[in-house]
Amino acid sequence: MWAIAGLISVLLAQAAAFDCSAKELEHYNFELLKGIHSVTSLKDTPPSQTNLTWYFGICEPIKEGLDACPQNSDVCGITSIILKGDSKNRVISEIVSFNTNLQKTYEPFSDSEIDSTGIAISYTGATWGDNSINAALRFVCPPKNNEHILDKFKLDSWDGKKLKASMYSKAACITSDKDKLKPPPKKPDNGESWGWFTWIFIFLVLFLSIYIVGGAWFQYNKGNAIDFSSALREVLDNFVELLKGIPAFSREIIEKFTSNSNRGEYSAV
């Protein structure tokens, strides 16, 4: 019973994740960003350094095992203390998580100051210790004269209560269905891959090899040849005779068809 309840809760959490097929995102192309993104802030705090890394799951939740993030997080922040000269050993001091089942709001915006539009996704209802925390992710459609790095998160602020992060991406531009993510075009074949003719040739060679060797072995086992080499020579001779007869056979077939067509023309007259 408990196992079934746990499975249901996991499925519900995944269903509520940052879903690229959500109705509010149907005019955008967030499939371009599908995956786990991160942004890191490093602060010098002698005699140590404080590393704050935020992870963002776009169109899929963050799985357990990524750093110290809890399972099924949409957004996860990990703060760790690193002693100078000992970067391998670190102490995790803070873990902040916005779970997939939190309430999310999607709000399109238009910013005249940067001459651009986009959509903001907000998380509410999360807790971190005794604190209630929220998150606002702002996805901006890059303007014409864009100087920002695309598809990279920027940590705008984190004060222990609200996370603000932003990203400039074409995924945040209103897109028609026909312009949405399409599979990348196939690279032209520059002779690096084998064509169908090559495969036919290979199979033909294999078939002939099996036919010749198998036929020789059959002749030898039946006692029709003194030794295997004689049997092989006999099969090869028969095969050569067969090849010589192919042109005459083809000519006979062609003549038969052409003569039939001529008879049809005469009868029509």
UniProtKB/Swiss-Prot annotation:
Disulfide bonds join C20-C59, C69-C76, C141-C173. The keyword Magnesium does not apply. Belongs to the ATG27 family. InterPro entries: Autophagy-rel_prot_27, Man6P_isomerase_rcpt-bd_dom_sf, MRH_dom. The gene is ATG27. It comes from Scheffersomyces stipitis (strain ATCC 58785 / CBS 6054 / NBRC 10063 / NRRL Y-11545) (Yeast). Keywords: Autophagy, Cytoplasmic vesicle, Disulfide bond, Golgi apparatus, Membrane, Mitochondrion, Protein transport, Signal, Transmembrane, Transmembrane helix, Transport. GO terms for cellular component: cytoplasmic vesicle membrane; Golgi membrane; mitochondrial membrane; phagophore assembly site membrane. The lineage of its organism: Eukaryota, Fungi, Dikarya, Ascomycota, Saccharomycotina. This is Autophagy-related protein 27. SUPFAM superfamilies: Mannose 6-phosphate receptor domain.
